[in-house]
């Protein structure tokens, strides 16, 4: 569980960071085959990750929201519509790094 993982991370002297992922690609077959709406899935994922982060006093790297707000989100996905493209991976890494950096700056 998130709670257990966060506890283990803190026990080892680190701060837990939740990697909030993205919804399947808008208009992609993985999303439509399940009958899901892109906006609803993106919102539900974001809410769930934020709730888990708040309940466990964890940092959040909200990559899903970065994908959602990107001007051309199609470019962020690999051909399968699930995994990130090279650009999507770079955005994810930047988001994680920013969350960690902000935490470090707040500790000073």
Regions found by a protein language model. Give the residues of each.
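Alpha-helical cap/lid subdomain in secreted, periplasmic
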Residues: 1-108
């Amino acid at each position: 569980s998130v709670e257990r993982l966060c506890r283990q991370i803190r026990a080892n002297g680190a701060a837990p960071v939740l990697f909030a992922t993205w919804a399947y690609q808008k208009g992609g077959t993985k999303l439509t085959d399940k009958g899901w709406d892109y906006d609803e899935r993106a919102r539900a994922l974001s809410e769930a990750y934020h709730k888990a982060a708040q309940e466990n006093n964890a940092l959040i790297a909200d990559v899903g929201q970065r994908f959602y707000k990107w001007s051309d989100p199609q470019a962020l996905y690999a051909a399968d519509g699930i995994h990130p493209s090279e650009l999507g991976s770079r955005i994810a890494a930047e988001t994680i790094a920013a969350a960690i950096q902000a935490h470090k700056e707040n500790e000073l």
